Amino acid sequence: MRECISIHVGQAGVQMGNACWELYCLEHGIQPDGQMPSDKTIGGGDDSFNTFFSETGAGKHVPRAVFVDLEPTVVDEVRTGTYRQLFHPEQLITGKEDAANNYARGHYTVGKELIDIVLDRIRKLADQCTGLQGFLIFHSFGGGTGSGFSSLLMERLSVDYGKKSKLEFAVYPAPQISTAVVEPYNSILTTHTTLEHSDCAFMVDNEAIYDICRRNLDIERPTYTNLNRLIGQIVSSITASLRFDGALNVDLTEFQTNLVPYPRIHFPLATYAPVISAEKAYHEQLTVSEITNACFEPANQMVKCDPRHGKYMACCLLYRGDVVPKDVNAAIATIKTKRTIQFVDWCPTGFKVGINYQPPTVVPGGDLAKVQRAVCMLSNTTAIAEAWARLDHKFDLMYAKRAFVHWYVGEGMEEGEFSEAREDLAALEKDYEEVGVDSADAEGEEEEGDEY
């Protein structure tokens, strides 16, 4: 088996976790108490969904997941919510004091009291796996627990499980909507710390998702539940190939192989289509080519940046539902001919395609319409550097005045860590810039006169 362990850190991570597990349960027909009427092999068996759920002898399906937060209120909602019976009480780990939006508290002072309990729990989950494939880590960049504790955890996971892949689903601080003043600090510190430990990081930006909810689903004032359910659909599309049998299945390491050209350039952009309300879906015929085209609209992206300004290094299309390869090839051919998609010149236009016959599931009473087919596009484009540039600029404005820095230093950090992290991110921006430069331009400077 190729099991995956999901780790949900901090408020954002836990709430994304709620949405994801709610959706997985619906997709697999697992009831909130963990029973699965359709499952004939009690206590194990080699079903595809066993990558995400372990089975007890009593036929109960338990998520291979850990929820961690440094303060109890958010996880308490899981403990008392609809799915309280799904999780083992020890999978829900909480501390007593908050990280208070402070990376240093999450990473040094408060975080270090919880880290061993968490690793111990993860070790127990890992021991139940026959062939652990890797970890999915859900967190935000802006919060104290999400930034500080996640980076501490990733460092420790690299030590304990060196070769296992680690994928992140991270909430990137939105350009306009801010939940904390110090988000740029936390984001840059956590990115610097986790850069070498993460194999692939899917970023989601709240503002981009707010806009999608407003525009496509006609929700005037989207709540976190609306946002998380949409994120859940994306996570579900990415992990569907691990949980179902399909014609063209992709596994975790396969994503990395196809999306990450250089170890540091591992931030793919996710786009999902169709995001449409039930009222509209009833009147529209969403063909494969339509949903494929929608993926190249910046409006459907999960992070605000414009791929038309950047170049693509890799592109991965994950279809689910009623889709045949012939339609996909036709759709891609059309896009290649008429779209202004620019690939870097050292990477021939390759689209990796995955098809999963399980149609997309929606949460009953949710906002999304039930559709026959959907697609999630993961593309590695140099445009995402815009997101880093925005963040770096905000960091610089505050750090020039050393605003708020004393809170971090007071928790045992050194000021040098700030400048070190900032330099690392400057290097990351530079890396993205260099990757996008045509190799012909780069070589042309050295060798003149070699014209054939």
UniProtKB/Swiss-Prot annotation:
Undergoes a tyrosination/detyrosination cycle, the cyclic removal and re-addition of a C-terminal tyrosine residue by the enzymes tubulin tyrosine carboxypeptidase (TTCP) and tubulin tyrosine ligase (TTL), respectively. This is Tubulin alpha-1 chain. Its EC number is 3.6.5.-. Residues 433-452 are annotated as: Disordered. It is an enzyme of class 3 (hydrolase). Its cofactor is Mg(2+). The active site is at E254. It holds the Pfam family Tubulin_C. It comes from the Eukaryota. The modification N6-acetyllysine is found at K40. Belongs to the tubulin family. Mg(2+) binds at E71. GO terms for biological process: microtubule-based process.
